[in-house]
Amino acid sequence: MSLLPHRQTQLKALLRRLGLTDNTPVDWNLVDLALTHASQSPEQNYQQLEFVGDAVVRLASAEVLMKHYPQTSVGEMSALRAILVSDRTLAGWGELYGLDRFLWITPAVLADKNGRVSLMADSFEALLGALYLSVGDLSLIRPWLSEHLLAKATEIRQDPALHNYKEALQAWTQAHYKCLPEYRVEPLDQNLPQQSGFQATVWLGDQPLGSGSGSSKKSAEQAAAQQAYQDFIAKEILPMPKIN
């Protein structure tokens, strides 16, 4: 299938934003498909490419983390990666490159502010999937995406809490279960010696994922999220909760 000249001109403009040239060996039909929303074409849209792109951005993130932070533990890498591949992060990069200007989508869906983050994240992943499948590797992605991944990873590591495990856990539960974790916090027994502060347990549906304590509610929740990461995400174990 050949694209209309106007559409191919649009797509070339997008790739130039990524730093790629007009002679880049891409499959233009795949790039076009990556920017086609289901509201315009229920059968031929970016959903499958989004699936591929999800794996691609995880691979690219792991590559950057391994290269620049080789001494980091698997648990910490997993926490970092979960934020790097979260909808909020990917949507931000989609906005940066103005993907909405190239989407084939109905005006109503495009104008939906509530679905904006998911839309931009999904289309960004689909574009990554199209670029990867065009050549079978990261050569069209690594030159421009790695700098964003490294900058974001550096920003996260400079966080006062070192890693925002709560944000990482939230990104992970949304990706796998389409829901948010719940934190249940209670004060520690004030009558016992050395028992000041709070105890938090993080739940996913009916299943507790981790517990932790801290001097504040926020630090206790962070500790609970960190344990959940160490026990589940770092070991790539998917719990099977009942979610209402």
UniProtKB/Swiss-Prot annotation:
Its cofactor is Mg(2+). Residues 11-136 form the RNase III domain. Its EC number is 3.1.26.3. Mg(2+) binds at E50, D122, E125. Pfam families: dsrm (PF00035), Ribonuclease_3 (PF00636). It is found in: Cytoplasm. GO terms for biological process: mRNA processing; regulation of gene expression; RNA processing; rRNA processing; tRNA processing. GO terms for cellular component: cytosol. Keywords: Cytoplasm, Endonuclease, Hydrolase, Magnesium, Metal-binding, mRNA processing, Nuclease, RNA-binding, rRNA processing, rRNA-binding, tRNA processing. It catalyses: Endonucleolytic cleavage to 5'-phosphomonoester. GO terms for molecular function: double-stranded RNA binding; metal ion binding; ribonuclease III activity; rRNA binding. Belongs to the ribonuclease III family. PANTHER family: RIBONUCLEASE 3, RIBONUCLEASE III. Digests double-stranded RNA. Involved in the processing of primary rRNA transcript to yield the immediate precursors to the large and small rRNAs (23S and 16S). Processes some mRNAs, and tRNAs when they are encoded in the rRNA operon. Processes pre-crRNA and tracrRNA of type II CRISPR loci if present in the organism. Homodimer. This is Ribonuclease 3 2. It comes from Synechocystis sp. (strain ATCC 27184 / PCC 6803 / Kazusa). The lineage of its organism: Bacteria, Bacillati, Cyanobacteriota, Cyanophyceae, Synechococcales. The gene is rnc2.
